[in-house]
Amino acid sequence: MAAISSPPLTQKALKVASPDTLHLVTDAPLPTLGQDDSVLIRVVCVAINPVDGKSAEMSPTPGATSGTDFAGIVVALHGDAKSRTETADTIKTGDRVMGFVFGNNPHVLGNGAFAEYVTLPRRFLWRVPDHMSLEAAASLPVGVASVGMALHYLRISMSSLLKAVSRSIAAPSASQPHDGAFDSDANVFILVYGGGTSTGAIAIQILKAAGFHPITCCSSESASRAKRLGAVATFDYQSATCGRDIRDYTNDSLTLAIDCLSESASMAICYEAMGSAGGRYVSLDPFPVRGCVRRSIVPDWICSFTQFGQSIPWAPPYNLDERPDDHRLAEEWYHLAQKLLDAELIEAPTLEIRSGGLLHVPEGVAAVKLGQIKRRKLVYHISEEALP
């Protein structure tokens, strides 16, 4: 292992103590660099996601470090990773990076974002572009990874996506329709239910960059931002005719939907909006089986932790076997997403930045769980050392 400085032997970390309870430990060991391309990062900022509170309540692993989204500074590399630092695409010590980690992980108790140090394989990290702050960077990883996984489950080809995104980067002002990145004759509309959520907003931007025509269901308060980010049309989810209006707008041709809320009401609107030919529906959480009211629509749901190539031994329905195809897809997606980030084609959500470090992060986890954080992402400073 090579390092630009000697990390301490112990660190502060938020550990799962019991259901719905996180406890600050001041003498936790640092996570180990256990893989050939693993990287040790000093955490500067973390963002709060619903899964942080949900997993600690639903499937707590006592002693496991909590937290998913982070941004920070690379301080050490595994020896094999160091040998590849001559290539331009390889992360080096001192680089600003962002990523998300499988917190509350029964397989690896000592690695989570809510800590002073975290480790991840190089292939699951993004460099933070020069134009982006670490606070903004911390707000993006779970969302960006989830969108990539959702596109994969919609059967959209990563190679075709890469070609479309490359064209957008080369000619950002040009409006170029998509030309067949999925295995059907469906048109270019894709419905994003929840365009006002962080992940929904990211999905809209990525779909636009890939040449699709994203449409979204969101609140009236979120509609203007969704359009600015690239939605060609917005629909108020509170309207009794929302699903029918989308179906009319798309001329009965909608075949693909991403549901960022994964509730009975959101699923019902997505199903009503889909054209008579059916299609694919992907939710970001387990969907209610009773909502599967049309045989022509193939439903599925994602759990982005499957990208790490491990089983997920949480309580049902999150007890998932290893999914090698998700792991392979994620490596391709991270490469593509870095291009989007570098080209400034993904804008961070509105941020609420709080200080207080790890000691106050549980307050933020509770606030997100209670639904008190609307249309913004909650970010905490963990280390002030690397901030300007």
From Swiss-Prot:
EC number of the protein = 1.-.-.-
Please state the pathway this protein functions in, per its UniProt record: Secondary metabolite biosynthesis
Q: Where does NADP(+) bind?
A: 51-54, 219-222, 237, 284-285, 373-374
Is Oxidoreductase a UniProt keyword of this protein? yes
SUPFAM superfamilies to which the protein is assigned, alphabetical: GroES-like, NAD(P)-binding Rossmann-fold domains
Q: Name one GO molecular function term.
A: oxidoreductase activity, acting on NAD(P)H
* One Pfam short name: ADH_N
- Coiled-coil stretches are none
Q: Which family does it belong to?
A: Belongs to the zinc-containing alcohol dehydrogenase family.
Per its record, how is this protein called by name? Answer: Trans-enoyl reductase tenC
